[in-house]
């Protein structure tokens, strides 16, 4: 063994003892006679002192040490002289006086200093990820990720779940994001797909009698990236037989409660708040509302009917709505700043943005169209105070909700009104389908294997084929046995009770405009499995990366994934994806056409 213990495990009780340690040179300071080294490993830092009085040879050797050299040292632990203690270090009251030093490996000059990260670009950090990961902040993130994963595994094991691995090379059944395809050398012209989720296999495991399955599983989606998305990601995935939504909701709440308690020593409040999909959209303009602040969207259509403002009246007459939100603290905005806010709303799809400042009364070009009493009624409904601004969007209900929902987040960011803590919610009663204007057909709000609510099944089976292509048909009214879990404005996970009868599953496929031939080709194996005695079952998948991101307070998923991709799905460290040689392509019977 190179060492007796980790750096931060050294205790004051060991003063006077000989100790061997290993790690990286974090800092080196030459104070004339003495050389001080901050020795770092994954647990922390300890100060090592080289003195010519102890060993001239080791002292001279220490002169050559540079940042990130890997060394082994042996020495006597001493108490630091009074006044030189470092309260920021666990080991700040002691130091190791070295009598032996071995340089295990050298380091080139660093592209950036590990303790000065503010000015370092993310691209450079990702290129030298092995250096970036040495930083205490990153080490902390991944140790916490490990503890979260272990807490989840232990909890699910205690509840009778069985961990089963599902295939990484599977069939392409695209319904949503693009698949990552893998060509088959042994079956020329055919392709595997990397799984977007283990959906079909975990359902088949329920049909196989496993009753309770879980997996910490890698998933892959070829989609445009943003701060909370990666092409490969990890899910906490589980499925249960003979359950109702309430059973799964209770398991998830208990699991997360124990996870936060064990890992962060935080008591989250359970049961979580519950919202219907309609309520979430109407109040917050999003099906993943951030509940760290209030600012609910209000429908003021009935009130503004009593105004003389033609823009509002015309919108209502055409079947639209007028909705408003409190612009917290925005009454101080200049006209040019309001114009920028209007441009932002327009970038979200709004035709414009009406506003009224609440500042010792009401100020706006449009106040002349409202009576004083009406303005007070609107202000009361929207919940504004002196110093705030009322922001209005007049349009179709869906667009007004979306625009104000996005402005709501912008306002909260500007006003710095997000509360500290973890704010969970369940979103329930989703529509089973939504209309895709581009494809002119209904698509699944979640996925095609989500069960309709019991009271909607007969209605669903009686929907005639011509209604499948009518956005106003009764298809839009069918509700799903689905439940999404939201944390601080992030969709943490989604689940549902699944369809366990072949006839209902086939009917869903038809509503989704999937032909009989396509059903057989893409999902035939799955529909066949449903004909051999499938139990009622349901499950959920939670995004482990997102959970860790929120629990650590990280700004991006890239700070909690060891080797992430950029927003162009590129790995600066390995330079993947990369070209392959012609021999490999020929073996796969692939010819490029770029």
Swiss-Prot record:
User: Which of UniProt's keywords are assigned here?
Assistant: Aminoacyl-tRNA synthetase, ATP-binding, Cytoplasm, Ligase, Nucleotide-binding, Protein biosynthesis
SUPFAM superfamilies from the xrefs? Class II aaRS and biotin synthetases (SSF55681), GAD domain-like (SSF55261), Nucleic acid-binding proteins (SSF50249)
Q: Name one Pfam family in it.
A: GAD
Q: Does the keyword Heme apply?
A: no
EC number(s) stated in the UniProt entry for this protein: 6.1.1.23
Per the entry, what this protein does is: Aspartyl-tRNA synthetase with relaxed tRNA specificity since it is able to aspartylate not only its cognate tRNA(Asp) but also tRNA(Asn). Reaction proceeds in two steps: L-aspartate is first activated by ATP to form Asp-AMP and then transferred to the acceptor end of tRNA(Asp/Asn).
Protein name according to UniProt: Aspartate--tRNA(Asp/Asn) ligase
Q: Which organism is it from?
A: Thermodesulfovibrio yellowstonii (strain ATCC 51303 / DSM 11347 / YP87)
Q: What is the lineage of its organism?
A: Bacteria, Pseudomonadati, Nitrospirota, Thermodesulfovibrionia, Thermodesulfovibrionales
Gene name as annotated:
aspS
């Amino acid at each position: 063994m190179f060492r007796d213990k980790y750096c931060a495990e050294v205790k004051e009780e060991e003063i006077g003892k000989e100790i061997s340690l290993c790690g990286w040179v974090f800092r080196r300071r030459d104070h004339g006679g003495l050389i001080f080294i901050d020795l770092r490993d994954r647990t922390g830092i300890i100060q090592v002192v080289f003195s010519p009085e102890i060993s001239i040879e080791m002292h001279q050797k220490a002169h050559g040490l540079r940042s990130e050299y890997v060394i082994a040292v042996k020495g006597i632990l001493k108490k630091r002289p009074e006044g030189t203690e470092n309260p920021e270090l666990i080991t700040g009251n002691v130091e190791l006086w070295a009598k032996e030093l071995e340089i295990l490996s050298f380091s080139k000059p660093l592209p950036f200093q590990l303790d000065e990260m503010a000015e370092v670009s993310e691209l450079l950090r990702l290129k030298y990820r092995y250096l970036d990961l040495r930083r205490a902040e990153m080490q902390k993130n991944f140790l916490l990720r490990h503890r979260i994963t272990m807490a989840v595994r232990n909890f699910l094991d205690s509840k009778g779940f069985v961990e089963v691995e599902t295939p990484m090379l599977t069939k392409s059944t695209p319904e949503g994001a693009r698949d990552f395809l893998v060509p088959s050398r042994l079956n020329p012209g055919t392709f595997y797909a990397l799984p977007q989720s283990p959906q079909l296999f975990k359902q088949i495991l329920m049909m196989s009698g496993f009753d309770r399955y879980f997996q910490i599983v890698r998933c892959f989606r070829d989609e445009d990236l943003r701060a909370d998305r990666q092409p490969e990601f990890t899910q906490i995935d589980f499925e249960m037989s003979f359950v109702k939504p309430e059973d799964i909701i209770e398991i998830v709440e208990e699991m997360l409660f124990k996870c936060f308690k064990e890992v962060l020593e935080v008591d989250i409040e359970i049961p979580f708040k519950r919202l219907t999909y309609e309520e979430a959209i109407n109040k917050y303009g999003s099906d993943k509302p951030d509940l760290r602040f209030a600012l609910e969207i209000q429908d003021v259509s009935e009130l503004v009917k009593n105004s003389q403002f033609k823009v509002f009246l015309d919108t209502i007459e055409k079947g639209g709505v007028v909705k408003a939100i409190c612009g917290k603290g925005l009454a101080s905005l200049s006209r040019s700043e309001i114009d920028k806010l209007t441009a932002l709303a327009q970038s979200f799809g709004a035709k414009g943005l009406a506003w009224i400042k609440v500042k010792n009364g009401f100020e706006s070009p449009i106040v002349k169209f409202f009576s004083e009493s009406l303005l007070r009624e609107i202000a009361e409904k929207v919940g504004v105070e002196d110093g705030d601004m009322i922001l209005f969007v007049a349009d179709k209900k869906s667009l007004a909700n979306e625009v104000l929902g996005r402005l709501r987040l912008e306002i909260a960011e500007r006003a710095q009104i997000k509360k500290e803590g973890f704010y969970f919610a369940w979103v329930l009663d989703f529509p089973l389908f939504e209309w895709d204007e581009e494809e002119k057909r209904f698509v699944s709000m979640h996925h095609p294997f989500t069960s309709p609510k019991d009271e909607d099944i007969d209605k669903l089976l009686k929907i005639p084929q011509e209604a499948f292509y009518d956005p106003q048909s009764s298809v839009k009214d069918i509700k799903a046995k689905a439940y999404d879990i939201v944390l601080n404005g992030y969709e943490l996970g989604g689940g549902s009770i699944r369809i366990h009868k072949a006839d209902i599953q086939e009917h869903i496929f038809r509503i989704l405009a999937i032909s009989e031939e396509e059903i057989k080709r893409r999902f035939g194996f799955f529909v066949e499995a449903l004909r051999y005695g499938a139990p009622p079952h349901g499950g959920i998948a939670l995004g482990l990366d997102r959970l860790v991101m929120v629990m650590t307070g990280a700004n991006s998923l890239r700070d909690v994934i060891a080797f992430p991709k950029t927003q162009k799905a590129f790995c600066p460290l390995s330079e993947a994806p990369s070209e392959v040689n012609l021999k490999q392509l020929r073996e796969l019977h692939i010819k490029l056409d770029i």
